[in-house]
């Protein structure tokens, strides 16, 4: 009796071990609240004065980005369309004939008077000894299309001010939704004169522009084949 109870208990332990453990979702990290700070007291303002300490640097200039560390808004409006089509057709026909009409000054009939129509009696255009012909044809058609559209606005920071009024700017944005992270990176050269009155510039006015838009996560992984498929594509010779 004790052996039966022991066997039944072992069986129950084994069956409970086969049950897959339920995966608990990872806890959401708590949101860190920003620390409050005391704002400095405002100096006594004169209602009848046009001067303000907060706007003192803009008395004789606007708020456009011109110095290192300034922020400029980059309006990315990119619509690219490309289409390429190629057709190739090639035909080649070749005909060769070989015959002997004379040999060391003797005609083919005098070489073999018994059988004037022997194997060496042929002439080009009449009865050639050897005749070959070949025909080659090649036809190919290729077409490629690509279209992309990116529209967004990114705040970029001035990294360097180059001679001639050029500013090197760079900005990035990271957006995370659930388990998917999207990255947008913009960098390039901007002329100070191209910065509009609202402190913005379009991506078409940037030189050496580099715009990257990519993501990491579940959706990005599903958009590409698996590692074994990519491996077979690289090593497959056919």
Curated annotation (Swiss-Prot):
A lipid is attached at residue 18 (S-diacylglycerol cysteine). Residues 22-50 are annotated as: Disordered. Residues 1-17 form the signal peptide. One of its GO terms (cellular component) is cell outer membrane. It is found in: Cell outer membrane; Bacterial flagellum basal body. It is a lipid-anchor. Keywords: Bacterial flagellum, Cell outer membrane, Lipoprotein, Membrane, Palmitate, Signal. A lipid is attached at residue 18 (N-palmitoyl cysteine). InterPro entries: Flag_Lring (IPR000527). It comes from the Bacteria. GO terms for molecular function: cytoskeletal motor activity. Disulfide bonds: none annotated. One of its GO terms (biological process) is bacterial-type flagellum-dependent cell motility. It holds the Pfam family FlgH. Assembles around the rod to form the L-ring and probably protects the motor/basal body from shearing forces during rotation. Belongs to the FlgH family. The basal body constitutes a major portion of the flagellar organelle and consists of four rings (L,P,S, and M) mounted on a central rod. This is Flagellar L-ring protein. It comes from Nitratidesulfovibrio vulgaris (strain DSM 19637 / Miyazaki F) (Desulfovibrio vulgaris).
